[in-house]
Amino acid sequence: MKVLSALCVLLVSVATAKQQLSEVEYRNAFTNWMIAHQRHYSSEEFNGRYNIFKANMDYVNEWNTKGSETVLGLNVFADISNEEYRATYLGTPFDASSLEMTESDKIFDASAQVDWRTQGAVTPIKNQGQCGGCWSFSTTGATEGAQYLANGKKNLVSLSEQNLIDCSGSYGNNGCEGGLMTLAFEYIINNKGIDTESSYPYTAEDGKKCKFNPKNVAAQLSSYVNVTSGSESDLAAKVTQGPTSVAIDASNQSFQLYVSGIYNEPACSSTQLDHGVLAVGFGTGSGSSGSHGGSQSQSAGSDSQSAGSESSQSESGSQSQSESGSQSQSQSGSQSFSGSLYSGSYSGSQSGSQSGNSGAAVKQTGAGSGSGSGSGSGSGSGSGSVSGSASGSASGSASGSSSGSNSNGGVYPTAGDYWIVKNSWGTSWGMDGYILMTKGNNNQCGIATMASRPTAVASL
């Protein structure tokens, strides 16, 4: 994880620099990103992915220079277009405009803060992979929390998303093509339970038949309640009682490339909802994704995906690529970065050679500076090498370390009211798999438009 942290610091600082990047800088950033995320491209695919990466890097640069509380970066989705991202990881938008949009008459203390991760009610971040089964992860997350609370805060058990994908089709869900959390709750209620993750593991694809086994049931639901549509105060009341399933608009490029801070996207829709997630708390003022026991542990499955393939995340590794021409370079120096949310420094070195379209050999040494996001200080070192030929092979490795701290004990500081939302894209996305979404901001992204919280049967 140390190498990835160091590389991420470098990539974010390059991406936030207020200057036009050279082709060499783009290529260096892409090479480092490929090594960190262990990407493998065919010769036919490489140039297309590189151009998409450059466009995403430009978008990140432009966004971050505006000083938003939302910080973007070159995360696990940096090599796919927004169209690919929506088609692969999101469901078909559900039109919730017909839902009654009224404010709840419940009175709620807006100063209160809740984080169910600190109560042991949230399982580690999971990864849906290239399957549009987000609804199943939202459902299991809410059910896991409900069962844990019904059992007196004892025995948190990870539940099977594959059980829901394979077996709830008759209720209206469509596996990897999408579904609704309420329909999944109905299935669990009528089915008298859902199996454990360990007994019915996730495959990231539609199963050919339902393999539910009542002997492996680890949770049962008695009912569920819907949040008053559009009411964030009612959503807060429900989240105070336990983790709550919510549907949101996650279609924007800013959501795709989110890395930290409070997510605030005015272009978000409150009625066109395409992603199921889990609200596990809310807060105000300085907040973070936090590190609360198991909730921040490595998830089941891989953290790194690209269009058409999946690979596992690691701190060092190698990959292949193909281009025409050749290019070699070596670089050493230091990188500094500062911003309203993050201040610190990165130092390190890298060297290598890679194939490239320019056919020119370039060597450079020096230091660079940029701006970034976060709070604290960090230092790290890294080295990497890439070699390639016209036939299209390349290998690379990276090693290094980084360290950092800030006033919040090493976490990203933010300001404002926010929802703590658990996603299902692995720990390489967002803040260790979480996103902080703006709260009390006109139901932005539809956070309270279509939300539900289940109630579990005790003593399971």
From Swiss-Prot:
SUPFAM superfamilies in UniProt: Cysteine proteinases (SSF54001)
Localisation: Lysosome
Main location: other
Modifications after synthesis and translation: Glycosylated; contains GlcNAc-alpha-1-P-Ser residues. Also N-glycosylated.
Coiled coil segments of this chain: none
Active site feature: C134, H275, N423
Annotated propeptide span(s): 18-111
Gene Ontology CC entries for this record: extracellular space; lysosome
MF annotations from Gene Ontology: cysteine-type endopeptidase activity; cysteine-type peptidase activity
Name of this protein: Cysteine proteinase 7
Signal peptide (UniProt feature, chain positions): 1-17
Annotated segments matching region Disordered: 285-409
InterPro entries: Papain-like_cys_pep_sf, Pept_asp_AS, Pept_cys_AS, Pept_his_AS, Peptidase_C1A, Peptidase_C1A_C, Peptidase_C1A_papain-like, Prot_inhib_I29
Residues bearing attached sugar chains per UniProt: N226, N252
Cysteine pairings via disulfide bonds: C131-C176, C167-C210, C268-C445
Gene that specifies this protein: cprG
GO biological process terms on file: immune response; positive regulation of apoptotic signaling pathway; proteolysis involved in protein catabolic process
Biased composition (Low complexity): 294-359, 386-409
Compositional bias ranges of the Gly residues kind: 367-385
E.C. numbers: 3.4.22.-
Keyword list, A-Z: Disulfide bond, Glycoprotein, Hydrolase, Lysosome, Phosphoprotein, Protease, Signal, Thiol protease, Zymogen
One Pfam family here: Peptidase_C1
Tree of life domain: Eukaryota
